[in-house]
Amino acid sequence: MKSGIPQGSVLGPILFVIFINDMAEVVKNLCELFADDAKLFRNVHLRDEDSNKSMQIDIDALVAWSRKWQLPFNVGKCKCLHIGNTNPCWKYKMEGRILEDVEEEKDLGVVIDKDLKFHRQTASAVKKANVALGLIRKSFALLDDQTLPLLYKSLVRPHLEYGNVIWGPFYKGDSQNVERIQRRATKGVPGISSLSYEERLRRLKLPSLQHRRRRGDMIMTYKIVTGKVNLDRKDFFTFAPNQTNRGSHPYKIGKPKAVKEVRRNTFSTRVVNDWNNLPKDVVLAQTTNEFKSKIDEYWGTKEECATPF
């Protein structure tokens, strides 16, 4: 939107939210709002022209809404992202202008690309982490095994883990590029730089990033399944029939059919095996912190999960 609010005002943000809060009510498709950004989206099919018409009708409705409330859209900044290889890539217009098609778009800090492989997002995260790691090395002449982990976990690792439940690298090259940042960081402590990566992690009490992504998947699954986040679990999982095996938990989920690698590595598919293999006492934890403690304890007893390296 072209409209804005004075920087630093107290009531400005609240008033702006009030002004745009009813925008989603004028459309029939899904519409998500964040500050002055709006996303309109829906599933489309090659032979379903109704979906094309539906999107255009909604765009026209938004334009009419903006004119009514004198909150004009900045059409030059409005883009169209078509996701999927079979997407018909229909053209849409706003105020008589054809919206520009893009291959990627940043959404809340995560670069979403048209094929959902997230190569650009991975490269962006690695670049930010590299810059942060470089600043640490320039700012501190000597780093010990206490200081480095603290700085790394505070300033570098967040860049590599922000939103990774969505974009977590599943291609070998991307995964190696992400892990390489931590490899370089752990060499910053004198006396252990010549040790193997696995041994450096043990000395610094750091898990591998791959292990943290796997653990993070389980934590998010737990939150969704148990209703600890404002997400409908039916949008993510199909629950399997009740299990009668002793020790089996009641929240087992079915694994959706996935042919393509991208689909196999989406969150709702990749978490199924790990989640279903968790014991009942872990899944039925009362709080998120209790779940974290129990899954760490459980995985620590399993040979395939015991080492986070």
Give, region by region, the residue ranges found by the protein language model:
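Short, conserved non-catalytic motifs in the polymerase core
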Residues: M1-L15, F41-D48, L99-D101, K114-D115, ...
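Active-site palm subdomain of RNA-directed nucleic acid polymerases
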Residues: P13-R42
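Extended, well-ordered alpha-helical segments in internal regulatory regions
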Residues: L155-F170, K223-V229
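Short, conserved micro-motifs composed of acidic
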Residues: R47, I57, L71-E105
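Basic, alpha-helical interaction scaffolds
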Residues: V102-V165
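Catalytic palm subdomain of template-directed nucleic-acid polymerases
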Residues: K39-A64
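Short linear motifs embedded in intrinsically disordered, charge-biased segments
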Residues: G173-F309
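Mobile genetic element proteins and their domesticated derivatives, centered on retroelements
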Residues: G8, G12, M23, D36-A38, ...
